[in-house]
C-alpha cells in the first residue's frame, strides 16, 4: 500500500480500548459486542488489572468498515477507543524507535501527530517519564521516513501504547472518533475554593458527555437547576460557577464556599420525594443509592417535564456491573417509551470509581 493512502483505506487489526483498572471484563464484553455489530470476526484479549482490552480480527480490515462502531463514546467503560494496526512484544532496550518506525512505515498510512501513552495502572504509569522523553526522537525518526506530517488535516494521530517496557500497541486516533485527551483522561485541576473533589466529577461529565456546542447552548448563565443530594455541595458549586441558579436539596449541610456564591438556595428535604414548583433547566444527582432507584427517579423527572436535562451518577454493585448499567437503560427506556425519543449517554469517567455517570434528555 502506498504511504499516501487515505485514512479510509487504511487496514487495521481490531479495536484497542483503555479503561479503569479492574473493569477490563466489562470493557471486553462491550467491545466484543461493538465488533460483532461492525461485522468483525475475531476475539477479545485482556488481562485483569491491565487497564485495557483489545479485539483482534482474524484478518486485517479496512478502517472504514469500523465506521460509527469505532466511536469512543459508545462503550460505557472505555476511556479511549482506537483502531489498532500492529503490536510488538520484544522491543529492544536501546533502539526502540527502529522497529516502531518500521511498523508504521509498513502500515502504508501517514499520521498527523504522535501520542505516547500507557495504561492507567500504578505499574504502567512508571513509564510516563519515558513516554515524554521518547516522543521527540520517535517523532523525528517518523518524519525522516515520511510517515509523519505534523498537523496535516485528514490524517489520523498515531497512538503508541506501552503496556510494558518491551511491548507496544500501535493505533490510529481518528478525528471526532477518539477521545481528545492522552490516555483518554481529561486534565482537570481542583479549584482551591471548591467544597469537595466531587466537583471534578461533574466538570468531567460536562466535558465528556456534552459536545462543545451543547456546553455553550445548554449551560447558560441565568438558567435554573436542582441538585438532589447536594451536600457538601461539589456539584452545586460547579453549576453556580457557570452562573446557574441552584436549588440544593439535602438534609445535610453545604460548605460555606457554596453559599458564598449567592447563587444557591439550600432546602433541607429528601431528594427522592421533593419536587420543584415549576420546571427547571437542569437536575443533577449524585446520591448514594441503588442504581435502579436513581435511574427510575431520573426518568420520572424527565418524563414529567420537571427538568429538561439531567446528569446523574449510578453507584454500581461489586458484581454484574455491566448488567446493572443495562438494567438502568431498560428502566429509563420503559418509562420514556410513551413520552418520545430520548438521548441517554453513559460513561465511566476518570473521576468515577465503582460508578458511572450519565446524561439524559428528550430529543427535540
Curated annotation (Swiss-Prot):
Molecular functions per Gene Ontology: S-adenosylmethionine-dependent methyltransferase activity
Primary localization class, coarse: cytoplasm
One cellular component term from this protein's GO annotations in UniProt: cytoplasm
Single GO biological process annotation from the record: methylation
Coiled coil (residue ranges): none
InterPro entries found in the cross-reference section: RlmM_FDX (IPR040739), RlmM_THUMP-like (IPR048646), RNA_MeTrfase_FtsJ_dom (IPR002877), rRNA_MeTrfase_M (IPR011224), SAM-dependent_MTases_sf (IPR029063)
UniProt entry keywords in alphabetical sequence: Cytoplasm, Methyltransferase, rRNA processing, S-adenosyl-L-methionine, Transferase
Active site, UniProt feature: 315
Assigned EC number: 2.1.1.186
Subcellular location: Cytoplasm
Record has Kinase as a keyword: no
Reaction(s) catalysed (UniProt annotation): cytidine(2498) in 23S rRNA + S-adenosyl-L-methionine = 2'-O-methylcytidine(2498) in 23S rRNA + S-adenosyl-L-homocysteine + H(+)
Residues annotated for S-adenosyl-L-methionine binding in this entry: 198, 231-234, 250, 270, 286
Quaternary context: Monomer.
UniProt family annotation: Belongs to the class I-like SAM-binding methyltransferase superfamily. RNA methyltransferase RlmE family. RlmM subfamily.
NCBIfam families: PRK11760.1
Protein name: Ribosomal RNA large subunit methyltransferase M
Gene name of this polypeptide: rlmM
Amino acid at each position: 500500500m502506498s504511504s499516501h493512502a487515505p485514512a479510509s483505506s487504511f487496514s487495521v487489526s481490531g479495536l484497542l480500548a483503555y479503561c479503569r483498572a479492574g473493569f477490563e471484563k466489562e470493557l471486553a464484553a462491550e467491545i466484543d459486542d461493538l465488533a460483532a455489530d461492525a461485522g468483525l470476526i475475531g476475539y477479545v484479549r485482556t488481562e485483569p488489572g491491565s487497564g485495557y482490552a483489545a479485539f483482534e480480527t482474524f484478518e486485517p480490515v479496512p478502517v472504514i468498515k469500523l465506521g460509527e462502531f469505532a466511536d469512543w463514546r459508545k462503550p460505557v467503560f472505555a476511556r479511549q477507543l482506537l483502531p489498532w494496526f500492529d503490536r510488538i512484544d520484544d522491543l529492544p532496550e536501546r533502539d526502540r524507535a527502529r522497529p516502531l518506525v518500521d511498523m508504521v512505515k509498513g502500515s502504508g498510512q501517514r499520521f498527523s501527530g504522535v501520542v505516547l501513552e500507557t495504561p492507567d495502572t500504578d505499574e504502567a504509569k512508571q513509564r510516563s517519564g519515558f513516554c515524554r522523553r521518547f516522543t521527540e526522537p520517535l517523532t523525528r525518526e517518523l518524519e525522516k521516513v515520511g510517515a509523519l506530517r505534523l498537523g496535516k488535516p485528514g490524517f489520523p494521530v498515531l497512538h503508541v501504547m506501552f503496556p510494558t517496557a518491551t511491548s507496544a500497541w500501535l493505533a490510529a486516533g481518528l478525528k471526532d472518533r477518539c477521545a481528545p485527551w492522552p490516555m483518554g483522561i481529561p486534565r482537570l485541576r481542583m479549584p482551591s475554593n471548591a467544597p469537595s473533589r466531587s466537583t471534578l466529577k461533574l466538570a468531567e461529565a460536562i466535558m465528556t458527555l456534552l459536545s462543545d456546542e451543547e456546553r455553550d447552548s445548554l449551560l447558560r448563565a441565568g438558567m435554573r437547576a436542582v441538585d438532589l443530594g447536594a451536600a457538601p455541595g461539589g456539584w452545586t458549586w460547579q453549576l453556580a460557577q457557570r452562573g446557574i441558579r441552584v436549588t440544593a436539596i439535602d438534609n445535610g449541610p453545604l460548605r460555606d464556599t457554596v453559599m458564598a456564591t449567592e447563587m444557591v438556595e439550600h432546602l433541607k428535604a429528601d431528594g427522592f420525594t421533593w419536587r420543584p414548583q415549576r420546571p427547571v433547566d437542569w437536575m443533577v444527582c449524585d446520591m448514594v443509592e441503588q442504581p435502579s432507584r436513581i435511574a427510575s427517579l431520573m426518568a420520572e423527572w424527565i418524563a414529567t417535564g420537571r427538568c429538561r436535562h439531567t446528569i446523574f451518577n449510578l453507584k454500581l454493585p461489586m458484581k454484574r456491573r455491566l448488567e446493572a448499567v443495562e438494567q438502568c437503560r431498560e428502566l429509563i427506556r420503559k418509562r420514556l417509551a410513551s413520552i418520545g425519543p430520548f438521548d441517554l449517554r453513559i460513561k465511566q469517567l476518570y473521576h468515577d470509581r465503582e460508578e458511572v455517570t450519565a446524561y439524559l434528555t428528550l430529543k427535540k
